[in-house]
């Protein structure tokens, strides 16, 4: 807030709008959608006053992200179509495909928007092209994050930039099963082999029952 006041007093609407965009994006990522939308709408107006189509497009993209997370698909058609058109016409596609200061901290968070646009025909050909540049042209759905695994040293799984804690797994055996399948990813295991690895001391009937739970 202080940065905006200083920028406004100096007559620098662009810096003020940039700060509003950054605040709005941060609030969107924190799932504080109502507050985020207020900041972003003000950023859109500010960038419009400054004749900055890039900033305006970035702010509107974050609005689309929030509407999609809230399943307000009816609000998306016009704005997402216009955002994609602006990206196509001005080479702003990197907002969807790479990490950037005004875009995503994880480029996968906007993939669900691209899948929706492709399927609904909202700049569908361009949305498909962006998906293909990510190697995701054929996906039918996407969670909106990249899953990364660290196996050297302590085992760690990250959902986007967020590390999943040990207690974040519903069951400890789920974590162990994931590790097992990762270890033997080139050698498919059948159910009996998995049960032997996870419950070596259990009789077959008990192991089978544990596997189903």
Where are these predicted regions, by residue range?
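Alpha-solenoid helical repeat architecture
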Residues: 1, 7-23, 34, 47-62, ...
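Tetratricopeptide repeat
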Residues: 2-3, 36, 40-43, 59, ...
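Intrinsically disordered, low-complexity protein-interaction/activation regions
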Residues: 18, 123-213
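TPR/TPR-like alpha-solenoid helical repeat scaffolds
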Residues: 19, 58-61, 93-117, 127-135
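TPR/TPR-like (Sel1-like) alpha-helical repeat modules
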Residues: 74-92, 111-122
